[in-house]
From Swiss-Prot:
KW Aminoacyl-tRNA synthetase (keyword) present: no
Protein family: Belongs to the LysR transcriptional regulatory family.
Span of domain HTH lysR-type: 8-65
GO MF term (any one): DNA-binding transcription factor activity
Main function: Probable regulatory protein. Its target is not known.
Any one of the GO BP annotations: DNA-templated transcription
Protein name: Probable HTH-type transcriptional regulator SinR
DNA-binding region, residue range(s): 25-44
Keywords: DNA-binding, Transcription, Transcription regulation
Protein's gene: sinR
Entry keyword annotation includes Cell membrane: no
Pfam family, one: LysR_substrate
Organism: Salmonella typhimurium (strain LT2 / SGSC1412 / ATCC 700720)
InterPro entries the UniProt entry points to: LysR_subst-bd (IPR005119), Tscrpt_reg_HTH_LysR (IPR000847), WH-like_DNA-bd_sf (IPR036388), WH_DNA-bd_sf (IPR036390)
PROSITE patterns per record: HTH_LYSR
Length: 315
């Protein structure tokens, strides 16, 4: 993107975009390798030239105005399209090179995406991937933190996003053998109301859970005994492994190793937890670089072929 900065008008817009994304003048200056005063002068020059206030700022706080939010979304698309044009002109042979930002939930970053990206960059040494861990799932096309490619669970809230539906997330109810020995086995979902549940929220995994067994269904009510609910799946898993409680929605791919090592057991295996939809999401653009297209297909293939416990592979 920095090629665009040769033109002063475009340079000012690029500085504005960076400030909007990081929310801090000093951090924007560091990332652009310029002084804080240069950032401040650039923003003032830009606002004076268009006669619109884009940012409200003081010594401790900075936020976009309504006009600033509109300008950010539009200029992000314009600069991205212009950069894509430059890439196409400079790369007629469609060599896979350049950089891309990919965001996913922390648990995916820690156990899967980091290894996938290492493999990808080994195959394509002229690439650089920025992997960001994000727990929130309510991305919209105008979200400042919306990266070039986003791994997302749940539902798509914004109709103007482009997405590809990939293999759904299989979920299991599980507990450690230690917990089962102490509190006994569970024979029906209704028994869960008498057990300790370690809950999850903000993962597309919150809210009432309905289990299915052939033509029968059972909805687990809010009466279950939840002492702790977290948006960090690994913190929940660690408590379950220690025998502190049961988790009702553990990703099957994450549970696989612990099930094979007899560190976890499936609770109510004859009851099915509904799959969670998974998507790769991005903003629409006129041109997609060879890197974007290849990386998108690579991540899709890696996710769709992730390790799963055998009896869950029954799609």
């Amino acid at each position: 993107m920095m090629e665009l900065i040769n033109n002063r008008g475009m340079r000012d817009w690029m500085i504005f975009i960076k400030v909007a994304e990081v929310g801090n003048l000093s951090r924007a200056a560091r990332e652009l390798d310029i002084s804080i005063s240069a950032v401040s002068k650039s923003l003032s020059r830009l606002e004076n030239s268009i006669e619109v206030t884009l940012l409200r700022r003081d010594s401790h706080h900075l936020e976009l105005t309504g006009a600033g939010q509109t300008a950010y979304a539009s200029m992000k698309r314009i600069t991205s399209s212009f950069q894509s044009l430059l890439d196409e002109l400079r790369n007629p042979d469609k060599i896979i090179r350049g950089s891309i930002k990919f965001s996913a939930p922390a648990i995916v970053c820690e156990f899967l995406a980091n290894k996938w990206i290492w493999e990808f960059t080994a195959s394509y040494p002229d690439t650089k991937i920025y992997l960001d861990s994000r727990e929130r799932s309510d991305f919209f096309s105008k979200s400042l933190e919306f990266d070039e490619l986003v791994f997302k669970s749940g539902i798509i809230e914004s109709e103007d996003l482009v997405y590809r539906k990939i293999s759904p997330l299989k979920l299991v109810l599980c507990a450690s053998p230690k917990y089962i020995r102490k509190y006994g086995r569970i024979s029906h979902p209704g028994d869960l109301e008498n057990h300790i549940i370690v809950g999850l929220h903000n993962h597309g995994l919150s809210g009432p859970l309905t289990l299915f067994r052939q033509d029968e269904s059972y909805t687990i009510s809010g009466a279950v005994n939840v002492h702790l609910s977290s948006n960090n799946l690994l913190s929940v898993l660690n408590l379950v492994l220690e025998g502190k409680g049961i988790n009702l929605m553990t990703p099957a791919w994450l549970a696989t190793k612990y099930l094979k090592n007899n560190e976890l057991e499936i609770i109510l295996p004859e009851w099915r937890v509904p799959d969670l939809p998974i998507y790769l999401v991005w903003r629409h653009r006129q041109y997609y670089s060879p890197l974007f297209q290849r990386f998108l297909s690579f991540i899709e293939d890696k996710w769709n072929n992730r390790p799963q416990i055998d009896f869950l592979n029954d799609d």
